[in-house]
């Protein structure tokens, strides 16, 4: 309607009633106010992205750095990436075990509390399968995310395509680099399309 009034003024040289001008200005102000409210809500309610998987490289930091350049409001979470802390937390907090099974069992139990909560709160779950190790925990967390109907983005090299075909099929995107993951997240959250 605003465009129609402006079209009449400029094309036909017609006059416009002062109430129509007031109406146009009020609509513009309302549209701007709605946009400001949406932007403020977007900034106050960042998306939660859980970064799961391989802990032997800086892929998490690479994703965070790229997304920082996009200025995308995101709150990141991740499992405990300190390998020894993750392995030994149960024995440190609940008492040591002589049997390695029970040592691992205690640690896994404590880690599951953190994992479950963070995945439940996530809007997007990114799972990285690295080159060197068989990441059973990463596959497990991908399964949890899928069961909870979370948006799942996988990050792995082509050499794992066949082994991960079932997990790939259940994901929303399969990426080959941290930069690709960041670009996908930026597009999904803000509609930013950069190559």
Language-model regions: role of each:
Residues 1, 9-14:
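Short, positively charged low-complexity motifs
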Residues 10, 27, 150-152:
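Hydrophobic alpha-helical elements and their junctions with loops/disorder across both membrane
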Residues 15, 24-27:
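Short, positively charged and aromatic/hydrophobic N-terminal segments
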Residues 18-19:
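Intrinsically disordered, low-complexity segments enriched in serine/threonine/proline/glycine
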Residues 31-195:
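Conserved catalytic or regulatory cores that recognize and/or transform ribose-phosphate-containing ligands
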């Amino acid at each position: 309607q605003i465009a129609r009034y402006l079209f009449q003024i400029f094309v036909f040289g017609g006059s416009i009633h002062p109430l129509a001008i007031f109406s146009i200005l009020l609509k513009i102000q309302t549209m701007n106010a709605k946009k400001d409210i949406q932007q403020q809500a977007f900034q106050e309610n960042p998306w939660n992205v859980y970064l799961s998987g391989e802990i032997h490289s800086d892929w998490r930091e690479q994703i965070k750095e790229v997304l920082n350049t996009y200025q995308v409001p995101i709150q990141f979470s991740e499992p405990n990436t300190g390998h020894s802390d993750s392995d030994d937390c149960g024995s440190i907090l609940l008492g040591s075990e002589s049997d390695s099974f029970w040592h691992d069992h205690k640690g896994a139990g404590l880690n599951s509390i953190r994992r479950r909560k963070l995945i439940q709160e996530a809007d997007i779950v990114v799972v990285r399968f690295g080159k060197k190790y068989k990441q059973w925990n990463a596959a497990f967390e991908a399964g949890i995310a899928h069961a909870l109907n979370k948006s799942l983005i996988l990050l792995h090299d082509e050499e794992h395509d066949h082994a991960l075909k079932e997990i790939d099929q259940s994901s929303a995107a399969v990426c080959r680099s941290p930069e690709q993951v960041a670009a996908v997240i930026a597009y999904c959250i803000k509609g930013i399309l950069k190559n």
